[in-house]
Amino acid sequence: LAINDGTLPSVTGNFPEVSRENRGLSVDGNLLSIDVIFPVLHGTYGEDGQLQSDLDQIGIPYVGSGAVASELAMDKAEAKSFFAKAGIAIAPGITVTEAQWKRDAQSVTDSIANLGMPLFVKASRGGSSRGTVKVKELSAFASAMEEALSFDSKVLVERAIDGAEVECAVLE
């Protein structure tokens, strides 16, 4: 919603409605014009490309990555595969589905033993670090898997890497 005179409009009743024809946001019958959207959301519908796709369809500009890049980045296992194919160094790890875990948890546990400790167990499509657990001992792996699987049916298990996190914006 747009800030007008330092205050946000009050939203009552139904949710606000974005109008393709008027390039605006209708709140209680009042049309607020939109210059650009700053999608400051995490997780599903915010980082997964859905909002970006919707905004693309109605022609409203926004700040940040496009729909396809957002969708790819939301799935950690897919993003990791994409980066590896592009020749970018990635942390050693495996992807485990819920079906694999339920079918043979011991084989999965055996396969991660070579990764070394500590490691991270992450819901592949979890946002805001939900479903992410740092595992320091193999005995904690099963509970970490259950935690991650409570957020997604696909889990990424990676060896922890010490390093600096670097972020940068790219302007087209």
Regions found by a protein language model. Give the residues of each.
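ATP-binding N-terminal substructure of ATP-dependent carboxylate-amine bond-forming enzymes
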Residues: 1-68, 72-74, 78-85, 96-110
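Conserved anion/nucleotide-ligand pocket segment
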Residues: 114-143
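Basic phosphate/pyrophosphate-binding loop/patch that engages nucleotide-derived ligands
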Residues: 82-90, 147, 166
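Phosphate-binding site of ATP-dependent enzymes
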Residues: 133-172
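Phosphate/pyrophosphate-binding betaalpha-module
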Residues: 89-96, 122
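Structured loop/turn residues at beta-strand edges in well-structured enzyme cores
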Residues: 32, 88, 115
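Hydrophobic beta-strand scaffold residues
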Residues: 61-62, 90, 119, 155
